[in-house]
Amino acid sequence: MKLEMICTGEEVLSGQIVDTNAAWFASTMMEHGIEIQRRVTVGDRLEDLIAVFQERSLHADVILVNGGLGPTSDDMSAEAMAKAKGESLVENSEWRQRLEDWFTRNNREMPVSNLKQAMLPVSAVMVDNPVGTACGFRVKLNRAWLFFTPGVPFELKHMVKEQFIPFIRDEFNLDAKVALKKLLTIGHGESALADKIEPLELPEGITIGYRSSMPHIEIKIFARGEKAIALLPRVAGHIKMVLGTAVVAEDKATLAEEIHFRLLNSGLTLSAAESCTGGMITSQLVDFPGSSSYLQHGLVTYSNESKVRVLGVNPATLDDHGAVSIPTVEEMAKGARAILDSDFALATSGIAGPDGGTEDKPVGTVAIALATRSGVYSQMIKLPRRSRDLVRSLSAAVAYDMLRRELLSEAVIVDYQSIGRFSK
């Protein structure tokens, strides 16, 4: 089966919107053992859409079309598909009724423009979208099935999981057994990870993939076939051992998710006092439902005055050592923990750049501390001088990893290949 994707929309084509839908779809398909062979992005021009539908349908078996199903004049996917096949649009009475019911339930009057979303090509098969007003559909043109989905990410994801994947599995008899193991890493470059993994002799049916999503690099271990799937846990365990401290989570999208899972199941509590990370530590945890059970408070103490008045940092500590220092960040962590007697508190203070660095403390210098009931762990690291956002996100990741290691009763301070550390 040859799978392709067509993404529509001027805002996507011009770069005004980053096409996260395409990245998610490709990754999701890969996790099911299905590889996308081609992706095309087209603007909101009827003739261009018609041309690409006709041309790509000669080469692909299945094409997922994303976007262009809304009620406005620049939503042209249904019209373009009808013209590409030489047929008219007709109203789908079932979807019109769904639209009317949706607006009634939400105590809103349905705009006339929304009726456009019930207009489908004559030969179209309706594809259910239970979470939105855009009607999905599929049409056979030349050798390909074109499967139309809305551009709203939540709606796309629902339709792909509930409609698209079952359809292609049935249509093309895709019964191959596939399993996937993910290892999340921090502090090591992709090439450094590959240098350790590539010499390993992998069993037949097992392959390795890498995905960089800073501050993480995700290692995907694919197993295809029953024999390979049976060997997957052993292979993943061996790779994890080879990579050592680089691996910080298994089958989690982010290190924040790993911390959320462990705190949620531990009954322990966390507070944070953030300077250079500016709320990243707490914000990423709040993304997960249930975080209120362990996250007591998060303070952004950016100024020296706030460090003194809110956290109780000694002014003499700031005068003698500066805001970006181990003594200061240790007092920040202790102060944050003491406010509500949390089990743990994380604190960060650093120079994210692009300016503000000195010879002794260049941009990328970050002090991080973890306060516990029995003491304080701290380190001052030197991060690669890249973007301000990367310095901040890497700082949050290292802070999370310190907490993760404490929760696992492991050494809290460890070496990372691409992160330096100042001596105390």
From Swiss-Prot:
It comes from Shewanella oneidensis (strain ATCC 700550 / JCM 31522 / CIP 106686 / LMG 19005 / NCIMB 14063 / MR-1). It catalyses: beta-nicotinamide D-ribonucleotide + H2O = nicotinate beta-D-ribonucleotide + NH4(+). This is Nicotinamide-nucleotide amidohydrolase PncC. Keywords: Hydrolase, Pyridine nucleotide biosynthesis. GO terms for molecular function: nicotinamide-nucleotide amidase activity. It is an enzyme of class 3 (hydrolase). HAMAP family: CinA_B (MF_00226_B). Gene3D superfamilies: 3.30.70.2860, CinA-like (3.90.950.20), MoaB/Mog-like domain (3.40.980.10). The keyword Cell inner membrane does not apply.
